[in-house]
Swiss-Prot record:
A single BP term in Gene Ontology: proton transmembrane transport
Gene: MT-ATP6
GO molecular function ontology, one term from the record: proton-transporting ATP synthase activity, rotational mechanism
Residues that span the membrane, as ranges: 12-32, 68-88, 97-117, 138-158, 164-184, 189-209
Protein name, per record: ATP synthase F(0) complex subunit a
Protein's UniProt keywords contain Transmembrane helix: yes
InterPro entries, per the entry: ATP_synth_F0_asu, ATP_synth_F0_asu_AS, ATP_synth_F0_asu_bact/mt, F0_ATP_A_sf
Keywords: ATP synthesis, CF(0), Hydrogen ion transport, Ion transport, Membrane, Mitochondrion, Mitochondrion inner membrane, Transmembrane, Transmembrane helix, Transport
Family (UniProt): Belongs to the ATPase A chain family.
Cell location: Mitochondrion inner membrane
Amino acid sequence: MNENLFASFATPTMMGLPIIMLIIMFPSILFPTPKRMITNRVVSVQQWLINMIMKQMMNIHNNKGRTWTLMLISLITFIGTTNLLGLLPHTFTPTTQLSMNLGMAIPLWAGAVVTGFRHKTKASLAHFLPQGTPIPLIPMLIIIQTISLFIQPMALAVRLTANITAGHLLIHLIGGATLALMSISPTTASITFIILILLTILEFAVALIQAYVFTLLVSLYLHDNT
């Protein structure tokens, strides 16, 4: 039975309810971590990697901004894990859904903006009108700055959605081409299979990079408002 090219991006449901959270939480329910494995090498490498990334991100923040450290750690871990799980066969990637990414981007962006207006009201308002702006351009510049401010969460969500979706589509297309060429031209099929393997490796890197970029941009928005 032939499926639509975008069928793999449709949200699976059970009795009319989305099962995204069940898919994400199910492995942790089945395989609880024993106490003796809490400090193993894998966990140590994971902690070292997260600490190194957070140290780079939080160096630019003051004490007020560093209160968001736990939130940013949770964010980069969640997005990275979700992206990697979506590369497994017969799985669904929630971050290909714009609605989910907007659900992450808008609250984080709004929290950073509200923090700025609460603690640095004058500085936040000053962003709408840079110093030295000619008087005739003031109304238009304020409108442009306001629009650019409200576009930030949309840009965050669209960037993540587009990058993850594009990679999955390429894997789907090249994988289908490989299967079709196996009976026609085994040599060409071997070449496309090698390309598929390389693209899959690249997608693992993209999955982690996009999690880092999303969290880094949230961190920069926070820095502008604290």
